[in-house]
């Protein structure tokens, strides 16, 4: 089923011909981690609206999150009729449209999904950013100085991940609630 409420909310957040204001208070990517916590029975400070699972259970023993970078709403619409998994989601579940954070780039969203912090709290805004402590342009996700092919050059320079990334972690927060979690990803990341 398609969540019509989400379509209407996101449509109302549009301005100009090309822009959508992030709906940080409800239908926004940044609310996915807290929604996962809530659905697993953990304390949650903010989450996506209950309408994202309208007609479905509001609590689960297990949740699988597939994070597919750059697979936005336009991609979903393009493949919805031809991809069996997307057809199954619509038939047996609920498809909701949500807004991206700003900026709508990979780096802030990767950090957000793992930390539970919206981009404004995480401080990671782009693939490359200037860090005043190092007085250098860095690539936070690769944890290196911009232009370097080598990984972890920031650590080699005495900079630690805690100096850059949020101290919060979705997985640590789930663990404090006695909820086991796993992340499967390429070891290169």
Annotate each PLM feature:
Residues 48-60:
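A short acidic-Thr-Gly-centered motif at the start of a beta-strand
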Residues 59-62, 179:
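Short coil/turn segments at beta-strand junctions that form active-site/ligand-binding loops
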Residues 51, 71, 122-125:
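Short, low-complexity intrinsically disordered segments
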Residues 1-45, 79-95, 99-189:
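His/Asp/Glu-rich, glycine-adjacent segments
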Residues 61-73, 113:
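Beta-strand elements within well-structured catalytic alpha/beta cores of enzymes
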